[in-house]
From Swiss-Prot:
Organism: Rickettsia sibirica subsp. mongolitimonae (Rickettsia mongolotimonae)
Protein name, UniProt field: Antigenic heat-stable 120 kDa protein
Top-level taxon: Bacteria
Bias-annotated ranges (Polar residues): 348-373, 380-396
A GO CC term assigned to this protein in UniProt: cytoplasm
Chief location category: cytoplasm
Length: 1011
């Protein structure tokens, strides 16, 4: 009995046969396809006399049709050349995966299940139809090699069928290209008349090209494709004009509306087989899978992803429903191709979904076709596949065999809840449970027969049902309620204020539930807040968040839990993308309501206040940097004016109410902005110097020394982390240190610069370079201070009357203090020293103490500034200077001619600025002394006014005629005269060099004037 024989299930393939078949497919493609040739629509018709019978079997369900109707050779060829090879490859991959499975017992069980079913000469439909095997099938289909192979089989199979059964190959009534004819009235409408081989008309096909507003579809890898043109074909449902069979094979179009090349073509084929009355009946549909629709309305066009490309099919969702209903009525079956969903009928839709942009509007969810009473119930093993439909991408699609929410809702909301609960009980996969809940929510909001109030009530009932459903695990309840909330968020038809009512009621149900733990309640609450924050207009967002806060306070939660929930609301607001002004307003409301309701602990209040402070600081920072940029890019202001203005901004920041840490962050942004500007490096360094001086000189009462150090470290960090080049950063670091010295900043402030470098996010070599720049600036500043002190002491003219001279004033203080003591001693008749002698002794002691104190302070200052010991003490520097002077004098002595000596003086004493001014002057003095001693030996009787030598005797001279009793505490330097002859040129050169060096700029910076 051929009706009970399945030649496909009986067909076994050895490895060698499979390889041979694959090779034949490749050869077939290379011989029969030409990439440059465009694929054509085709059709094949036969009369009753040509119809050949084969068993009518569902390659997807494995069941013979109840009435034992037969199918023609075309259908058989599709199954044999496409479906079965795809199945074989899929099973082969599943067996490979089972061999690698760690659970050996399960692997062996499944392997035996497959082998035993094969032995019964079946097409493994039981294995494919078992939901427990879905994970093995899905895993196999994740292999890119398998997907590519299945697509290759499909393309080769269609080419094979179309060529084998083509009219060109001599097959009676075989496939031939459709000859479309344009309608005279419209260029986008075409038609063709299909006749059987006897010349009788079977039907008229109408094709419409739709040029639509572009909409976007998402591919599996997440990339998006725009569709602006596709076509629709009005496939016939009932045919009663003439006898025969008909197969309509329509090529899928590319995203741009053009036909692909033949080597990439896939087809949507409708199989009309001769029925009992001789008329064609729609028995099967061959379509590449997963089949998807660009929307939920009946006019949504079908599309597929094949070989990484998007193709549109010439069938709408409404037409597909009609055709599938007719297939079922005619006891036929859909033939699904290409991927897992192509082969395993009744196990649900694929995981990919299209992304529909706002340009593509969608209507309400599709209601499944209503079948006549005599049609048996559709089961998972014989139900036609429901195609995918979605408005947004998601990770998992709901099982269409469980979901009929729109139909259930057409009765009553209770019917829908009963239906959903039955599905939740039956389905153990939590992902599918969640999808069922989401689909129910979508059906509620898309129900055109319901008004807003009814939709709100139904959504609230669904949320409550989800929370209280005992068949849902806690995590599934969270995900289910969140799915309802997400559906509310994505609904485009419900006004925002009406959404608010749904959100408030849902939050109340969640928080008052006794079936949820606090953690789960918080997760759902956070999702509700997210939905509120996603609303487009400011007013709706504010009202929604306030409403949710009110609900939290009014619930039956404990005081502690209410505080926790309010903090969760505040945290969501704080991390949102709202403007700072909106965040401040919303967080301020959370704090105010929480304090008034006495549900926030002091720690929680402090946390919210910290959020508010940070937002305030961010806003201040943003505003400040805008002002700084305006100043930097002002073409009418010079560097001095820019510096003054930025100093004023810096001062305002330091005087502000923010914490020292926040002030430091703002100052860091300022220096970083200056450093990254397009100004010249010298100009940027000058501005940075002004910032450093402003920080160093800021009032200690409003900004403590540790806080100054913290802010100064931040200032340097802003420089160090700027994107400008390293030499510029080094120069600006020096500028910052110079600013500190100009502002008389202490060593703690200078050391903070090193701290800022250490804490910056730069590499070690850059840190080392910046530290060297900082130390060099500190060294130079100390040298200037020391030199200024030395010059100040040297510059005091003892011969002139200076009533305000430091030493004179100190001497007067000593006299005033000593006189009463002397008078008391004289009265006691004890021997005393004269007043003059006492003054000399005291003054000498004071000078000595001043000298020691100066040396001690300088050395301590250097030690504090250089924790790593890389700044030398004054004694070390003096010893180093003496050594360098001796080296220069010795080197000078090696020059024999006057010209060489003059050149040495210019090169090493005048031009070499790397030597300190002090070393060069000491060298000149020593060389002059040597030159003059030599001349004095030659002519000891001749003296000159130009040479000063220390006299062998000391004598104190009166300060002035008005004060004859007070003598200056310094030895008088006598003058000798020597003869200047042979070395006059050298001595002249030395003295000229001395004058040049002494007139050099001491690099003193002019303090910035403040208004």
């Amino acid at each position: 009995d051929t009706s009970e024989f399945d030649p496909l299930a009986n067909k076994e393939y050895t490895e060698e046969q499979k390889q041979t078949e694959e090779q034949e497919q490749k050869e077939f493609l290379s011989q029969t396809t030409t990439p440059a040739l465009e694929a054509d629509d085709g059709f094949i018709v036969t009369s009753a006399s040509f119809a050949q019978s084969t068993p009518s079997m569902s390659a997807l369900s494995g069941n013979i049709s109840p009435d034992s109707q037969t199918s023609d050779p075309i259908t058989k060829a599709v199954r044999e050349t496409i479906i079965q090879p795809q199945k074989d490859n899929l099973i082969e991959q599943i067996l490979k995966d089972l061999a690698a499975l760690t659970d050996r017992d399960l692997a062996e069980q499944k392997r035996k299940e497959i082998e035993e079913e094969k032995e019964k000469n079946k097409t493994l439909s039981t294995f494919f139809g078992n939901p427990a095997n879905r994970e093995f099938i899905d895993k196999a289909l994740e292999k890119p090699e398998l997907k590519k192979k299945l697509e290759s089989i499909e393309i080769a199979g269609y080419n094979n069928v179309h060529n084998t059964f083509s009219a060109a190959s001599g097959y009676p009534g075989g496939f031939k290209p459709v000859q479309w004819e344009n309608h005279v009235s419209a260029s986008d409408l075409r038609a063709t008349v299909v006749k059987n081989d006897a010349g009788d008309e079977l039907c008229t096909l109408n094709e419409t090209t739709v040029k639509t507003k572009p909409f976007t579809l998402a591919k599996q890898d997440g990339t998006q494709v725009q569709i602006s043109s596709y076509r629709e074909i009005d496939f016939p449902i009932k045919l009663d004009k003439a006898d025969g069979s008909m197969h309509l094979s329509m090529v899928a179009l590319k995203a741009d509306g053009t036909k692909p090349s033949k080597d990439k073509a896939v087809y949507f084929t409708a199989h009309y087989e001769e029925g009992p009355n001789g008329k064609p009946q729609l028995k099967e549909i061959s379509s590449p899978k997963p089949l998807k629709f660009a929307g939920t309305g009946d006019d949504a066009i079908a599309y597929i992803e094949h070989g990484g490309e998007i193709y549109t099919l010439a069938v709408t969702r409404g037409k597909y429903k009609e055709m599938m209903k007719e297939v079922e009525l005619n006891q036929g079956q859909s033939v699904d191709l290409s991927q897992a969903e192509d082969i395993i009928i009744g196990q649900g839709q694929s995981k990919e979904q299209p992304l529909i942009t706002p340009q593509q509007t969608t209507s309400s969810s599709v209601e499944p076709p209503q079948y006549k009473q005599q049609v048996p119930p559709i089961t998972p093993t014989n139900q036609p596949l429901q195609p995918e439909t979605s408005q947004m991408p998601q990770s998992q699609q709901v099982n269409p065999n469980l979901l009929n929410t729109a139909t259930a809702l057409s009765g009553s909301m209770q019917d829908l809840l009963n239906y959903v609960n039955a599905g939740l009980t039956k389905e153990i996969d939590s992902n599918k449970q969640i999808d069922l809940i989401k689909e129910a929510a979508t059906a509620i909001l898309n129900n055109e027969k319901s008004d807003i109030a009814e939709k709100q009530a139904n959504i609230i009932a669904l949320a409550e049902n989800t929370v209280n459903n005992k068949n849902l695990k806690p995590d599934a309840k969270v995900a289910g309620v969140n799915a309802v909330l997400e559906t509310i968020k994505n609904d485009q038809n419900t006004p925002n204020l009406e959404k608010l009512k749904m959100l408030e009621a849902t939050v109340a149900i969640i928080l008052n539930s006794e079936n949820l733990e606090p953690k789960q309640k918080q997760q759902m609450l956070e999702k509700a807040v997210d939905v509120g924050l996603s609303l487009k207009d400011d007013a709706s967002r504010a009202v929604t968040i306030d409403g949710i806060k009110d609900v939290v306070i009014k619930t039956n939660l404990s005081t502690e839990d209410k505080g926790t929930m309010l903090i969760a609301v505040g945290d969501k607001v704080n991390v949102s993308e709202l403007s700072n002004a909106e965040k401040q307003k919303s967080l301020g409301s959370v704090l105010k309501k929480g304090v008034e309701a006495q549900v926030l602990s002091p720690a929680q209040q402090q946390l919210i206040q910290q959020h508010l402070d940070k937002i305030t600081a961010e806003q201040i920072k943003k505003d400040t940097i805008k002002k700084v940029n305006d100043i930097l890019f002002d073409p009418l202001s010079n560097t001095e004016l820019k510096t003054t203005n930025i100093q004023a901004i810096t001062s305002n920041v330091l005087d502000g109410p923010a914490t020292a840490k926040v002030k430091g962050e703002i100052i860091q942004e300022i220096t970083n902005t200056v450093a990254g500007s397009s100004l010249e490096a010298q100009d940027k360094a000058a501005i940075i110097k002004g910032i450093g001086e402003t920080i160093a000189t800021h009032s200690d009462t409003s900004l403590s020394l540790p806080n100054k150090a913290l802010i100064m470290a931040s200032a340097e960090k802003g420089i160090a982390e700027s994107q400008t080049n390293l030499p510029d950063r080094e120069l600006m670091t020096k500028g910052l240190v110079d600013g500190i010295y100009e502002g008389k900043g202490g060593p703690e402030i200078t050391k903070a610069v090193s701290s800022g470098i250490d804490n910056s996010n730069i590499n070690d070599s850059e840190k080392e370079a910046l530290k060297k720049a900082k130390d060099a600036a500190s060294e130079a500043a100390l040298d200037r201070d020391t030199q200024n002190l030395t010059e100040g002491l040297k510059g005091q003219n003892i011969e002139e009357h200076k009533p305000h001279d430091d030493i004179y004033n100190k001497a007067r203080e000593v006299i005033n203090a000593v006189n009463p003591v002397i008078e008391a001693l004289e009265k006691s008749k004890e021997p005393v020293v004269s007043a003059e002698e006492r003054i000399v002794q005291e003054t000498s002691s004071i000078l000595n103490n001043i000298s020691k104190l100066a040396v001690e302070k300088v050395n301590n200052f250097r030690a504090m500034l250089s924790p790593n010991g890389n700044l030398k003490t004054l004694e070390e520097k003096k010893e180093e200077s003496i050594k360098k002077v001796d080296e220069l004098v010795k080197a000078f002595g090696t020059k024999s001619s006057t010209e060489e000596q003059q050149s040495f003086i210019k090169t090493n004493l005048i031009d070499d600025k790397t030597l300190s001014k002090e070393v060069r002057l000491q060298t000149i003095d020593k060389l002059l002394q040597e030159q003059k001693r030599a001349e004095a030996i030659e002519n000891p009787s001749v003296k000159t006014e130009d040479v000063r030598v220390v006299s062998g005797k000391s004598k104190l001279k009166p300060i002035s005629k008005d004060n004859p009793d007070i003598e200056k505490a310094k030895m008088v330097v006598g003058r000798d005269r020597v003869n200047i002859k042979g070395n006059i040129k050298i001595m002249g050169a030395l003295m000229n060099a001395r004058d040049i060096i002494q007139s050099e700029n001491l690099n003193k910076s002019t303090p910035i004037k403040r208004e």
